[in-house]
Amino acid sequence: RTGMRLDNSRTVSVRNGVAIIPVVGPVFRYANLFTEISGATSTQVLATDLQTALDDPKISAIILNIDSPGGVAAGINELADQIHAARDRKRVVAYIGGTGASAAYWIASAASEIVMDETALAGSIGVVVEAVVGGEETNGRKRYQIVSRNAPNKRVDLATEEGRAKVGETVDAMGDVFVAKVARNLGVEPEHVPEMGDFGGLRVGAAA
């Protein structure tokens, strides 16, 4: 069941004295029509809602419910510092149920604890700057991405064997979790699961 909306907050719900704050979708600094319609996250709104939860004596703990690929860097450092300082007042848990990447992981790292679903994705620690260059000498418009040197895997080149292999590592790891859980649920050995599932294909019910 959903919780009750916390008074004087934009996004916070409350269940059993625990404030749940969503960090969902792309992260931007300021709230606007796009963030309202698309369900993106504004660090400005998030910071205000976090403070409201901290100041409410009925709130015993805070959960940051994260499913975000990250977003704009502006405002993230201030928000993360606020979350880190909040740990001295109340327990702050970051739960990553889907994706907690880039700026979203920066936010999660400031919490007292990070809890992740086994199929969640986290990381992508690094910075990317994108620029579009246009003009006659460029034969039209070209987009460039500059990645911080500490994060060469943040934007892998799928046109290269190395890039495809790096993405394959993540896909294989997710596939291993999938197989392990199906094996547990059905009470069979993991090595039998791929064949049962036609090695990624589909079976009709009569043949399953």
Give residue ranges: language-model regions.
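Glycine-rich beta-to-alpha transition loops that act as phosphate-gripper elements at the mouths
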Residues: 95-101, 196-199
